[in-house]
Amino acid sequence: MLSKIVGSVIGTKNDRELKRMRQIVAKVNAQEAAISALTDAQLRDKTAEFKSRFDEGASLDSLLPEAFAVCREASKRVLGMRHYDVQIIGGITLHEGKIAEMRTGEGKTLMATLAIYLNAISGKGVHVVTVNDYLAARDAELNRPLFDFLGLTVGVIYSQQPPYEKVAAYQSDITYGTNNEYGFDYLRDNMVFSLAEKKQRPLNYCIIDEIDSILIDEARTPLIISGQADDSSATYALINNIIPRLTRSTDEEANKENEDGDFWIDEKNRQIEISEKGYEKIESFLIEVGELGENESLYSPIRLPLLAHVQAAIRAHHIFIKNVHYIVDNGEVIIVDENTGRTMPGRRWSDGLHQAVEAKEGVEIQAENQTLATTTFQNYFRLYDKLSGMTGTADTEAAEFKSTYDIDVVVIPTHKPIARIDLEDQIFLTKLGKYKGIIREIKEIQAKGAPVLVGTATIEASEELSYLLDQEGIKHNVLNAKQHEREAEIIAQAGSPKAVTIATNMAGRGTDIILGGNWQAHISDPDNVSPEEMQRLKAAWQKKHDEVLAAGGLHIIGSERHESRRIDNQLRGRAGRQGDPGQSRFFLSLEDDLMRIFAGDRVVNMMRAMGLKEDEAIEHKMVSRSIENAQGKVESRDFDARKNLLKYDDIANEQRKVIYSQRDDLLAEADLKQAIEAMHRDVYDALISQFVPPGSIDDQWNIDGLEDELESEFKYYMPINDWLDSDRRLDEEGLREKIVQTAIARYRERRELMTPENAAQLERHFMLQSLDRHWKEHLTQMDQLRKGIHLRGYAQKDPQQEYKRESFELFQMMLGAIKSDTVQDLSRVHIPTREELEAMEAERLAQAERQQMMFEHDEVDSLTGERHSDPDVEARNLAAEQQATATKAPAAANGNNPYANMNISRNAPCPCGSGLRYKQCHGKI
């Protein structure tokens, strides 16, 4: 209350920002007369002039008024659209690295061209991020004529894109693509073996469309590149047979004390817990089928993976619901995004959940994957020098944007006042009663001649409503994940008079519903339409448009409240675009998940005490407040979860930055001799300490063991006993130094047998191979540590501090292992000729190309890892199969083995980088 009073007196922060920006808008408008007098050639030459001024030291801020005026004039000439003043405010917001909240239909795509143009002048590249490939391609093609006119290049990145095309797209002044593709390209760039293979330039400036969807809804979404791990499909099928034998607790709260069931479910967090009785029953079954020994327990460390299978199976059967969280199509389990209602083909939950659902549905169980590289959207997008975004709904999450990304939200005023009427919610006792109320409302809206869009949270709800409308004889269209092929056609006509469209949350974010329908959709051949036909279609559309306006515009019906107010606002925002009339209302029931789980008993008891009939509704502020409080609780819980995840991921992110920085240094460094010699000192020193402890006397030394270990590890015998016999003064420190110097001298001798270029190439190859192999294993260890770290809380320890400490220890061990493997490989390997090195590199590139093709192909069938309790948060995962799959037919099989003369141990990793042992790859007989 106090903040409202103060705001009314001195104005809000948003008001002050708008006031400041309007002064800049005035400067842009002051340039309009002079800029509009320029010829096309003179207008085009302005870009080169701006670039020259920038190179000479002018800031982008100083260029803004004139550059925006140039972009607006070019848009007017090329696209036939002139930026409104509010769109210029939006452009300023984006340029300043803020989020522009702009209502649906206000022209976000056109607004963004201003900030894109200005920031492209720097020559460092601008990345425009969209939520799917269609929108990236659409926006690029819409704006390409404008940017071509202004002398800027435009590129689009997409999955399965040939490498040379992707490089060209990233070298363009402006690059369009999806958040997934940018993130995966970043990870792929940090898996290459030469700088020439990298695709991305340094990350400069980024504009994210629908930024709330990407940085809030998908913030907990890890981007994962993975390869196939061991197949355990038989175990999933076996565990699936246990679940029908288990009994769910009838009283979830009492169960923890009385154990009246085998497991209970935490619906709020979508997790399960198994009772002691349940553990005993599961163990008995596993012993019965031979999966568990007589004296073994599920609690034993070696059996924890089996326990994870059981937990995943229970979640699959009792938490994840068909046609709500996933659908089954052509024998495949496909995830449904609960935020958008879209299916996500190829994405898979991780931690065995997807395989458990496949076992439950009786379809083919696909193999699990192993993580090769990973990051999160939170950490990836924070790598940009400047980050901005736009959406229709961001203000409710302004605090999170500020605390996590240090970005402010500016609410951009609409060009015309909003004419949409948002009616009070109607609450019913039962879901069926709610559906009856919705159908009654649809009939009333149709009688007026207005179109209606019914938003549902799940596919199941959309199909239930569709069935009831069929029973009433009401013609309608259904837009959900099962009909996504018809999305464009359905959305195009959703604004026609009396049209009824049922849609899940996927209902075309990024696509406007035009009142009267889209007349252009009726043109079958755009290249051959006559002017008369076009005029006829426009006239017919105008008649329908006027009819819908007279009927009150598009009417929105929400079939239930989403857990997030932002998603509800997105649905409301489908109506009332650009000052059009419209109406919205939500219909709720006590059986809705949000009401059932979060609404207080007081609300439920009050409604039941009123004696309402099934299809009677109430509108009450207390109920509305209760719903808003419930949504606030969920949003707060989700914010805390994202914030908590970020704390953990920040620890992993620091390690990731160190590894990727080392990789870049390796790729860029021409001479690695000093680095390799330093590695020799570290590795030999550590090994010596195992047999000659620091500060020890000679009676404590194990010289025979040291000689054997050095010969075994490095294929080089050092006569240490002879040294000691011939020099009685050789103490522990002197002996240590003599061994290290001997090892370095041998390295130098072997290196002299090669040219400096050949030596650097071989050293770089082994160092990168070792680094990548151990980083992959480290990611798996970090993942396992993260899953169990919460248990430290029971020992009165801070899980986050424990994770930080242990992950650092693991990281130190990994760095030591990288050095050790590199020194071992270089000590053992046969000195290759130039021809052998060229053959080795050619084979690596050929394999990389094979892997890239499989990698890109599998991106369509990508793997989504469900890493959190909330099922609408899935981890992005490309099932790259980079390791075993790409080398199923190694070159050795046809006699082409570039490593044949290199004296490589058959159990050593293959030098080609496949991840297989040499005997299983190029050393295959």
Swiss-Prot record:
Disulfide bonds: none annotated. CDD domains: DEXDc_SecA, SF2_C_secA. Its main location: membrane. One of its GO terms (cellular component) is cell envelope Sec protein transport complex. May bind 1 zinc ion per subunit. It holds the Pfam family SecA_PP_bind. It is an enzyme of class 7 (translocase). It is found in: Cell inner membrane; Cytoplasm. It catalyses: ATP + H2O + cellular proteinSide 1 = ADP + phosphate + cellular proteinSide 2. ATP binds at residues 87, 105-109, 512. Zn(2+) binds at residues 910, 912, 921-922. Its cofactor is Zn(2+). SMART domains: SecA_DEAD, SecA_PP_bind. Its EC number is 7.4.2.8. One of its GO terms (molecular function) is protein-exporting ATPase activity. It comes from the Bacteria. It is a peripheral membrane protein. Gene3D superfamilies: Helical scaffold and wing domains of SecA (1.10.3060.10), P-loop containing nucleotide triphosphate hydrolases (3.40.50.300), SecA, preprotein cross-linking domain (3.90.1440.10). InterPro entries: Helicase_ATP-bd, Helicase_C-like, P-loop_NTPase, SEC_C_motif, SecA, SecA_CS, SecA_DEAD, SecA_motor_DEAD. GO terms for biological process: intracellular protein transmembrane transport; protein import; protein targeting; protein transport by the Sec complex. Part of the Sec protein translocase complex. Interacts with the SecYEG preprotein conducting channel. Has a central role in coupling the hydrolysis of ATP to the transfer of proteins into and across the cell membrane, serving both as a receptor for the preprotein-SecB complex and as an ATP-driven molecular motor driving the stepwise translocation of polypeptide chains across the membrane. Monomer and homodimer. Part of the essential Sec protein translocation apparatus which comprises SecA, SecYEG and auxiliary proteins SecDF-YajC and YidC. Belongs to the SecA family. This is Protein translocase subunit SecA. The gene is secA.
